[in-house]
Amino acid sequence: TQASAITFLSVPGQGFESGLGFIQNYFGAPFALIIIAAIFLPLFRKLNVYTAYEFLGKRFDSKTRLLGAGLFLLQRGLGAGITIYAPAIVLSTVFGWSLDGTIIASGIVVIIYTVAGGSDAVSLTQKYQMAVIFAGMIAAFAVLIWKLPSGFGFSNAMTIASGMNKLNAVDFSPSLQTRYTFWSGTIGGLFLALSYFGTDQSQVQRYLSSGSLRESRLGLMFNGIFKIPMQFGILLLGAMIFVFYQFEPPPVYFNQSAWAERASQGEPEQFRKIEDDFAAIHAEKRVQLDRWMEADRRGDTSEADAALTETHSLQKQSDEIRQQAKLMVGGGIKGNKPASDADYVFITFILNYLPHGLI
């Protein structure tokens, strides 16, 4: 399914910030996989190639093959570093290890079992990885629901997520200003998936190493069937984390180390004021949420609507303060652009609320 630890750790942040709308980016993937299974696979097997770039060499020349392979290795090398970095943050914090040492040790372990075991070892570990990801999703959902206020269950959480517009998965708007829509996800996602699954060796090697054309196609179809539901579950987890942080005080900026570093470099009083304002709005929002839920239980529609409107107003103020915090952090890193902390939303939840033995 092309998923990795970085998918599980970072994508919930998208669900936290923008809801389920990010799922539309994957709508084109099933169509791309069908095209690859029908056209790309038979062509690769007919030419008896072992890499996508070997095909470039046979179709064009060795220079084209080397250019494609070199660009792939550069891109994958950078991507692998990020993939190792995210889980290393969690492991180093839980066990008290050095972050640099954890990254190096993880890289060495991966290199050893990959070189020693080849594609068989990679396929085997990917099966375990998928099991761990699904088990982790279930465990995170269970802990989330368990830590919600007493008498507040999953249905109540879904009510809040829906009321706060976090469950709007599909947008058919033709607007070019909307970030995630059905049309951009289907059309753009189709070509992105074609390029990734059809030409990226990290994916091509998976179906070229299978025993037959039929097995390769079955693998792609399995991917197409499970890709969207899996991503939906991860995004829903992010939406539930949003609900959780309506009751538990969240940090104004989830990358706490970056926030502390910028505070030490700038004016600490300004950073504390941002934190105090954010906490005050969160406390008031909690009052309005309780008012909304109580009115909803009584069936008082007008009172519930009034409380929901006030909650939306407070959420807008909260978002504005978080945006200001991102600008304050980003101002010291990349000019005037806001820094992003979405990748740290789920990591923060894991480190602060999940039992370390479960991690």
Residues covered by each model-derived region:
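Hydrophobic alpha-helical transmembrane segments in multi-pass integral membrane proteins
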Residues: S4, R76, I82, A142-W146
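Membrane-interface "cap" regions at the ends of multi-pass membrane proteins
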Residues: T1-F8, R65, Y113-G117, G136-A142
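Helix-loop-helix module between adjacent transmembrane segments
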Residues: L20-G117, L167, D171, S184-Y196, ...
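Membrane-embedded transport cores of multi-pass solute transporters
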Residues: N48, K127, F134-A135
